[in-house]
From Swiss-Prot:
It comes from Campylobacter jejuni (strain RM1221). One of its GO terms (molecular function) is metal ion binding. GO terms for biological process: polyphosphate biosynthetic process. Mg(2+) binds at residues 367, 397. The keyword Translocase does not apply. Belongs to the polyphosphate kinase 1 (PPK1) family. Keywords: ATP-binding, Kinase, Magnesium, Metal-binding, Nucleotide-binding, Phosphoprotein, Transferase. Its cofactor is Mg(2+). The active site is at 427 (phosphohistidine intermediate). SUPFAM superfamilies: Phospholipase D/nuclease, PHP14-like, PPK N-terminal domain-like. This is Polyphosphate kinase. It catalyses: [phosphate](n) + ATP = [phosphate](n+1) + ADP. The lineage of its organism: Bacteria, Pseudomonadati, Campylobacterota, Epsilonproteobacteria, Campylobacterales.
Length: 694
């Protein structure tokens, strides 16, 4: 089949539409503080998009690259389309923010500027300024002897236009840098938040004594945050990375956000020094630095404005009184997070660190929280003399510094730390524990779609799989040998590994379904679909009558509802949990269910080390089948992709199905039913039966 550019949706525009679906949560019947969270998430996503994707397009344009995507849009065409899209959507963001804050005021929760406070609260703000703000802010003059300062990426500042009180004709420009150590808002009372910049503005003349404030404007800058590291030439990768992190702080400016109706001379002053293209200047009639809205959205005093808190549950066969190794030795176990608890994953490593029979622990780490109990357990194990091998991916974007910290701590404890494979990121999520029982070695594996991160495990949907099967032991051992040694054979037998092997396997399974024509069925859930070869194979399968359902949270470059894709349906689910699992079903393959750390994107399939895991266990397959069925039935959180690249909400039927809420209810029902059941085997069987029936 010959493809043409008009058969693909542009990657960047598809991502923007994903972020629009995040913002669209503000239009739904959600608690007010939940809506505020979605504004914070939307703005955080947009920050990263500008730091990486827009910055990259600017570099391609500067380098004279003409085409950089399957749809053959040039970098300049993409930049123009992005700017047009975001300038239009800015008005929607402003409207949602104003609507939400107005509704919050009816609930007696306020964001108030200094000038709108009563005298008592103004006095409290004044006291806070002199005790907490004044000592740490940085007043900056800009003139012939004071060059324009370095502004950190995503830094928040106040630009000022001032004049000498004795000589009003002498106008000067400067700025007040607001350090990140200060909270975004001052909580002047239990229900009133004051933006920090309005307090600073009020006291600007005390910051610049002898000068009169003529105008001020809050602004925020975004820099190119992508890093290019010459790994081939690096003798000490850790040192090279640390140098790269320092250089990243000096990346080119790619965006300026500034308050609307700012003094024209202030805007000109900033543009002159930052050299930002005028279309990359965004003027807002609302507050800036909205990722910091989490400070308000997390207010526990207003719990009625938040969704009910769900506590993940641990289900049989896991039991706090039973060794996790005994449970995994009996059967393969699959859990779906965050509906089921992440605790068994932590217990897997914690128990291994304390078990005297354990001789080896191997693990990959990609994104780890700052206070990681899992990494601490690895440190304890290494300190106790166990053989601990950890692949710490130092190139995990925006987690580099945290991963550097843990890599050093693990090395200091005696662990063997691997920093990666030259030219690739290691994105696979896998751990292996080896126990010596008598004269035999026993292997236990955990393979996952998500990170070893207890914090994200509470808000990301992911799938974890525990097994002690020999074929998985063989392949995970080979995988860790590839990571730690030299190997030209990067192929596994039961697991599939990228680069290359996962893509080959996926294409092979699509071809099998294609050969079955109208009997073929494919269901695939992932974060993003970009790879043009896989998209072409799906088009060919569709034309042969294969029924294809794709559940894709983010980017999708495939066009449904065309003659060549009339049997392909694409939906996206956006809810309070970030859909992060990758689950694939191919009706006529054996096995026919898979989980993976990899999306169907060139970067995952060709430039990363990833794993795809076949699921053989019948209970686990039944669980995945129910998971996919629920997501395909969702008519609350789901959006349908149209052939023009836009999305529409799926209309609700008489039966309302919110897949995330339904899974919370299912798991809670199982947990409640089994809580008092002391027969472990009966409890395990009942848990499987209930999950399947529901």
């Amino acid at each position: 089949m010959q493809t043409s550019p008009d058969m693909f949706i542009n990657r960047e525009l598809s991502w923007l539409r994903f972020n629009s679906r995040v913002l669209d949560q503000c239009s739904k019947n959600l608690p007010l503080l939940e809506k505020l969270k979605f504004i914070a998430i939307y703005c955080t996503n947009l920050d990263e998009f500008y730091m990486i994707r827009v910055a990259g397009l600017k570099q391609l344009f500067s380098a004279g690259v003409n085409a950089s995507s399957s749809d053959e849009m040039t970098p300049l065409q993409q930049l123009k389309a992005i700017r047009k899209y975001l300038h239009q959507e800015k008005e929607l963001l402003e409207r949602y923010f104003n609507e939400i804050t107005s509704e919050l005021e009816k609930e007696n929760l306020f964001i108030k500027h200094y000038e709108n406070l009563d005298e008592n609260l103004k006095q409290k703000c004044d006291e806070y300024f002199f005790s907490n703000i004044f000592p740490v802010i940085v007043p900056i003059a800009v003139d012939a002897t004071h060059p324009f300062p370095h502004l950190n990426n995503l830094s928040f500042s106040l630009a000022v236009k001032i004049c000498d009180k004795a000589h009003p004709e002498l106008v000067k420009f400067g700025m007040i840098r607001i350090p990140r150590v200060l909270p975004r808002f001052y909580e002047v009372s239990a229900n009133i938040y004051v933006p920090i910049e309005s307090i600073v503005h009020q006291h600007a003349e005390e910051i610049f004594p002898g000068y009169k404030l003529l105008a001020s404007a809050a602004f925020r800058v975004t820099r190119n945050a992508d890093m290019v590291i010459e790994e081939e030439e690096a003798d000490d990768f850790m040192m090279i990375l640390e140098q790269g992190l320092k250089l990243r702080r000096k990346g080119a400016f790619v965006r300026l956000q500034i308050q609307k109706d700012a003094d024209e001379q202030i805007v000109e002053f900033l543009n002159t020094h930052m050299k930002i293209f005028h279309k990359d200047v965004y003027e807002y009639s609302i507050l800036l630095n909205l990722p910091s809205l989490w400070q308000i959205a997390g207010n526990k005093t207003f719990t009625h404005l938040l969704s009910p808190l769900y506590t993940p549950k641990t289900l049989p066969p896991f039991d706090e009184n039973l060794s996790i190794f005994d449970a995994v030795e009996k059967e393969d176990i699959l859990i779906i997070q965050p509906f089921e608890s992440f605790d068994p994953v932590y217990k897997f490593i914690k128990e291994a660190s304390k078990d005297p029979e354990v001789i080896s622990i191997r693990m990959t780490l990609y994104r780890v929280e700052k206070n990681s109990n899992i990494v601490q357990a690895l440190i304890d194990a290494a300190s106790d003399g166990k053989q601990v091998t950890v692949m710490v991916e130092l190139k995990a974007r925006f987690d580099e510094e945290n991963n550097l910290h843990w890599a050093k701590a693990l090395e200091n404890a005696g662990a063997h730390v691997i920093y990666g494979i030259t030219g690739f990121k290691v994105h696979a999520k896998v751990s292996q524990v080896i126990r010596k029982q008598g004269d035999k070695l026993k292997f236990y594996m955990h393979l996952s779609t998500g990170n070893y991160n207890a914090s994200s495990a509470k808000i990301y949907t992911d799938v974890s799989y525990f097994t002690s099967k020999a074929e998985f032991a063989r392949d995970t051992t080979s995988f860790f040998h590839i990571l730690s040694g030299f190997s030209k054979n990067r192929r596994l037998q039961t697991l599939s590994m990228s680069p290359n092997q996962i893509k080959e396997k996926v294409l092979e399974m699509i071809r099998i379904e294609t050969s079955k024509k109208n009997e073929g069925v494919i269901v695939a859930k992932m974060n993003s679909l970009v790879d043009s070869d896989i998209i072409q194979a799906l088009y060919e399968a569709s034309m042969e009558g294969v029924q294809i359902d794709l559940i894709i949270r983010g980017i999708c470059c495939l066009k449904p509802d065309e003659e060549y894709s009339k049997n392909i349906r694409v939906r996206s689910i956006i809810g309070k949990y970030l859909e992060h699992a990758r689950v694939f079903y191919f009706k006529h393959s054996e096995p026919n269910y898979f989980i993976s750390s990899a999306d169907w994107m060139p970067r995952n399939l060709e430039r990363r080390l990833e794993l795809m895991t076949p699921i053989y266990d019948e209970r686990s397959k039944a669980k995945l089948a129910q998971f996919l069925r629920l997501q395909l039935s969702d008519n609350v959180l789901a959006y349908k992709l149209k052939n023009n690249g836009e999305y529409e909400k799926i209309p609700s039927s008489e039966k309302i199905i919110d897949s995330q809420q339904t899974l919370e209810e299912y798991v809670s029902k199982i947990y409640k039913t089994l809580k008092k059941d002391t027969d472990q085997s009966r409890a395990t069987h009942l848990a499987s039966k209930l999950f399947k029936e529901n």
